[in-house]
Amino acid sequence: MNLWQQNYDPAGNIWLSSLIASLPILFFFFALIKLKLKGYVAASWTVAIALAVALLFYKMPVANALASVVYGFFYGLWPIAWIIIAAVFVYKISVKTGQFDIIRSSILSITPDQRLQMLIVGFCFGAFLEGAAGFGAPVAITAALLVGLGFKPLYAAGLCLIVNTAPVAFGAMGIPILVAGQVTGIDSFEIGQMVGRQLPFMTIIVLFWIMAIMDGWRGIKETWPAVVVAGGSFAIAQYLSSNFIGPELPDIISSLVSLLCLTLFLKRWQPVRVFRFGDLGASQVDMTLAHTGYTAGQVLRAWTPFLFLTATVTLWSIPPFKALFASGGALYEWVINIPVPYLDKLVARMPPVVSEATAYAAVFKFDWFSATGTAILFAALLSIVWLKMKPSDAISTFGSTLKELALPIYSIGMVLAFAFISNYSGLSSTLALALAHTGHAFTFFSPFLGWLGVFLTGSDTSSNALFAALQATAAQQIGVSDLLLVAANTTGGVTGKMISPQSIAIACAAVGLVGKESDLFRFTVKHSLIFTCIVGVITTLQAYVLTWMIP
């Protein structure tokens, strides 16, 4: 087949081209906010519209377009859906074996206040999981835990998506930062330093914001000491670790520091009023559980599924383990790489999105052993043995997990199909170039490019792979630091995670809100836009006023 070259301005006017390119995204927003369609229906129609735009407007060859849709769908199944299946399975094992009541009791013994439980589980534990695994696992696990603690499913999912803003940039052992360095040629350590000079401000803001969502101004007044301890310790550790150690460990270090500081603080301090969602009966049951006397051994045993999960995910994430499966590694043959027919290196990305015409690779990687989902499955198997769960119960639990997740898995597949057709057709790059045409105001809009990338792909890593080079080019054109705008792509990207269709589908799957994706999207969308504007203001100030903050 011939090499097809992307054309980012088919209409001959970048604004008109970007308007047509935005049709699938505008439809997706409209479908969830106004039409209130189920997630899988909205995603299916969005793929159809994106495919039509790619074929009719961008003149993408039919074979290339269909191949990108199929590639995206399978990428949604592996590795993304695999992570969700394994994570929900671990949670169900904990519930089925009766251990979750003990976990709930142990958290209630630290604090019965659900605002503070949100800080412990949603923020601290979620940030740790983001640092170790990323790619949807933290929201799935923490949202399920919070539902078990008595949170309403919509609130658990929505709050976890919003609070996940703080750690995403350094997620999965710093992969978003490392990828930004690879595609721009800028030292990834310096990018990490710059992100570490933007995100700590957002961390504090996000935690106060969460308290306001949960309990209004009263919530802020009653919990501010705990928020300052949790957010302040996290922000300081995030700044120090990113600026003096590197981009791989800020989430791991910051989350552990924050968890330790918050737990010790809550032994000395509790809010004057205990805040609980839901009815009085449920609260009374929880308070009874809080006073149930479990031994330290029982509590430790109950937490073992999540301790196993933490251990296996961390092991799978460390560089020596990853190196085994990399090219030239001892176990490289265990990774099955399948070049996608009719797509691999048959589409060329063109300047100014890249410095020179570059063939776009499309290789499906089936890393059956080294995938994060497999690490979580190992934790599940260890838990089954350790908790002496009957094999028949374990099999039926896994079966019910698959049955429950069938529709969400289809949704995730369609969402990734949309992301891939957007990328391979050049649709996403058209939107990026339109933003880059805003001149000196681009410092404000720069984070929106990262936001758009994460909305489209569900991943800060993928957003950086798509747009970091364009950010660097635009920065040079308007005379500001390329390091700053590449970092802004990463920092802005984290604010798009909470409305990314992939994240919405994952969160709904984890808390049993299948078909309610529109409710969750409406819950998070305004917060996402406000946070992106805040990052835009921070970036603009750093570009023109606080230039001393740039490394």
UniProtKB/Swiss-Prot annotation:
One of its GO terms (molecular function) is lactate transmembrane transporter activity. The chain crosses the membrane at residues 13-33, 37-57, 69-89, 131-151, 159-179, 194-214, 220-240, 244-264, 366-386, 405-425, 438-458, 494-514, 530-550. It catalyses: (S)-lactate(in) + H(+)(in) = (S)-lactate(out) + H(+)(out); (R)-lactate(in) + H(+)(in) = (R)-lactate(out) + H(+)(out); glycolate(in) + H(+)(in) = glycolate(out) + H(+)(out). Keywords: Cell inner membrane, Cell membrane, Membrane, Symport, Transmembrane, Transmembrane helix, Transport. Inhibited by the proton ionophore carbonyl cyanide m-chlorophenylhydrazone (CCCP). One of its GO terms (cellular component) is plasma membrane. The keyword Protease does not apply. Disruption phenotype: The glcA-lldP double mutant is unable to grow on glycolate and displays undetectable glycolate uptake when grown in the presence of glycolate. It is a multi-pass membrane protein. It is found in: Cell inner membrane. Induction: By L-lactate; aerobically. One of its GO terms (biological process) is lactate transmembrane transport. Uptake of L-lactate across the membrane. Can also transport D-lactate and glycolate. Seems to be driven by a proton motive force. Belongs to the lactate permease family. This is L-lactate permease. The gene is lldP.
